[in-house]
């Protein structure tokens, strides 16, 4: 499990252990390794595969000797896992219950999908900003799939070999803009701060069965909606396979697989994405239209 922390003015990778986070730079020094300490570079270079293999073979035990290198997550600010993915794919209405929330039908043959710019991206604890142009903004907890290698025309049964890991995501929508016209989907999804990403990347070896993961949208500590991955209309396996038939997928590309339900957010709210076995992603909400918020 990887996290990204802001250390000495730079965002660097760290490995999660039972004792806390150990900077990857410290691991490199201790074990004479050269893994990239930037999380996106670690993925794109193929270094994450080597790091995972080392961790499974001997690294998990070896890290137990590095308690002096553990940094407190409270002492350093967590960051998004990385900031410049080549692609952010979002999947809409992938749970029937969420489609009903919007008085829509779940797509059948082809998943409803959209893309988001990387300027939407924020990390744990960063403020989600409700923009002037929206009077009704919603937040959605989602499972994120991070692609681990360049791939095209992936068979569904091979999907997991193309995945670097999984993470928690909060996707934001200016719902009132979307409801005006479905062609406004891209605009409604593309405001700054409308995609929170992190705090940990969980590699596939840590998850016995992705389909059993429970995904929840939580508002102010109360579960607004939850469902399990098995109930998705389009499974993560299908999504990786299908999207790879549309375009080449690249290391670090993100697929946000859809939400069990969206909640309307307002100034002062706390939004959370919970996924069973994952560290939760939490973000406060600020409304730009509030007094003194400009």
Identify the function of each model-found stretch.
Residues 1-107, 208, 292:
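N-terminal non-catalytic cap/leader segment that marks the start of a structured domain
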Residues 3, 77-80, 101-104, 128-137, ...:
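A generic local secondary-structure boundary/capping motif
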Residues 7-9, 16-20, 147-149, 219-221, ...:
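Short acidic-glycine loop/turn motifs at beta-strand connectors
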Residues 16, 105-124, 139, 272-277:
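Structural signature of FAD isoalloxazine-binding scaffolds in flavoprotein oxidoreductases
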Residues 56, 71, 75-77, 98, ...:
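Catalytic-pocket segment enriched in acidic/His residues
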Residues 83, 123, 138-140, 250, ...:
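Residue-level recognition of short, solvent-exposed, well-ordered loop/turn junctions
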Residues 114, 144-149, 240, 252:
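Short, conserved beta-strand element in jelly-roll/cupin
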Residues 119, 124-159, 169-172:
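Non-heme Fe(II) oxygenase catalytic core, chiefly the N-lobe of the double-stranded beta-helix
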């Amino acid at each position: 499990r990887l996290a990204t922390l802001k250390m000495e003015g730079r965002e660097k990778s760290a490995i999660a252990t039972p004792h806390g986070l150990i900077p990857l730079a410290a691991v490199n020094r201790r074990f004479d390794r050269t893994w990239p300490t930037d999380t996106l570079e670690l993925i794109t270079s193929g270094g994450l595969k080597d790091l995972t293999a080392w961790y499974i073979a001997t690294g998990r035990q070896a890290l137990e000797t590095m308690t002096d290198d553990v940094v407190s997550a409270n002492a350093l600010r967590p960051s998004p896992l990385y900031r410049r993915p080549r692609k952010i794919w979002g999947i809409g209405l992938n749970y029937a219950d969420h489609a009903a929330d919007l008085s829509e039908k779940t797509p059948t043959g082809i998943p409803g999908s959209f893309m988001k710019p990387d300027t939407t991206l924020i990390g744990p604890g960063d403020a989600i900003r409700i923009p002037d142009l929206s009077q009704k903004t919603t937040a959605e907890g989602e499972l994120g799939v991070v692609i681990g290698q360049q791939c095209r025309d992936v068979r569904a049964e091979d999907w997991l070999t193309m995945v670097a890991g999984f993470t928690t995501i909060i996707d934001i929508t200016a719902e009132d803009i979307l409801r005006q016209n479905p062609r406004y989907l891209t605009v409604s999804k593309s405001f700054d701060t409308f995609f929170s990403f992190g705090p940990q990347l969980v590699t596939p070896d840590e998850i016995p069965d992705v389909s059993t993961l429970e995904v929840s949208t939580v508002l102010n500590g109360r579960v607004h909606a939850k469902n399990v991955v098995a109930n998705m209309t389009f499974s993560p396996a299908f999504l990786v396979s299908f999207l790879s038939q549309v375009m080449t997928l690249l290391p670090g590309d993100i697929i946000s697989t859809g939400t069990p339900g969206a909640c309307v957010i307002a100034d002062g709210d706390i939004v959370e994405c919970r996924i069973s076995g994952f560290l939760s992603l939490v973000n406060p909400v600020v409304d730009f239209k509030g007094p003194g918020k400009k």
